[in-house]
Amino acid sequence: MSQFLSLRNCLRLTIRLLRQFRRGEGMKAVIIMGSKSDLDYSKKIASKLADFGIDAVMRIASAHKTPEKVLEIIKEYEKEDVVFVTVAGRSNALSGFVDANTSKPVIASPPYSDKFGGADIFSSIRMPSGVAPMLVLEAENAALAVAKIFALKDEGVREKVVQFQENKRREIYKADEELR
């Protein structure tokens, strides 16, 4: 009888793992903005993610003003296959705060600002020990970074990443030919 239960538990585990790793199931990027002023930049990320076949959810919460809201959002998605993308200008506490409170990948993608000569980027670079959000500038590159993470598990996403890279190479060759 104990062998039967053990076999049954193994089958349940196998079925659960197969469901979990089914192509594309549950994979999404959760874009957390520090404020509504980050919405246009976040929409660019979401648009590029759609090109890779990746769903995006956009949320607004501030590590400075509403840290409890940030924690609620993290908890809401903690059991899913997600990559968090944090978008916060000025003083970017959001990226480190999210990373310190999740085991999921966090990509910090602060929008560029001419104010302060772009120096606000430094708040995204230096993090305390044990806090490691990945810094990726530009909306398209942030989406590509998310896609590469999901490509580890999803062949369809991997193929789209490879095609994207090939298209970028073709653009260079074409630009060179046009100059000749």
Curated annotation (Swiss-Prot):
GO BP terms, alphabetized: 'de novo' IMP biosynthetic process
Lineage of source species: Archaea, Methanobacteriati, Methanobacteriota, Archaeoglobi, Archaeoglobales
Family designation: Belongs to the AIR carboxylase family. Class II subfamily.
Keyword ATP-binding (UniProt): no
Pathway annotation: Purine metabolism; IMP biosynthesis via de novo pathway; 5-amino-1-(5-phospho-D-ribosyl)imidazole-4-carboxylate from 5-amino-1-(5-phospho-D-ribosyl)imidazole (carboxylase route): step 1/1
Keyword field: Lyase, Purine biosynthesis
Positions with a binding annotation for substrate: 35, 38, 62, 65, 89, 91
A GO term, aspect molecular function: phosphoribosylaminoimidazole carboxylase activity
Record keyword Lyase present: yes
Functional summary from the UniProt entry: Catalyzes the reversible conversion of 5-aminoimidazole ribonucleotide (AIR) and CO(2) to 4-carboxy-5-aminoimidazole ribonucleotide (CAIR).
Catalysed reactions, as listed in the record: 5-amino-1-(5-phospho-D-ribosyl)imidazole-4-carboxylate + H(+) = 5-amino-1-(5-phospho-beta-D-ribosyl)imidazole + CO2
UniProt name for this protein: Phosphoribosylaminoimidazole carboxylase
EC number: 4.1.1.21
InterPro entries: PurE_classII, PurE_dom, PurE_prokaryotes
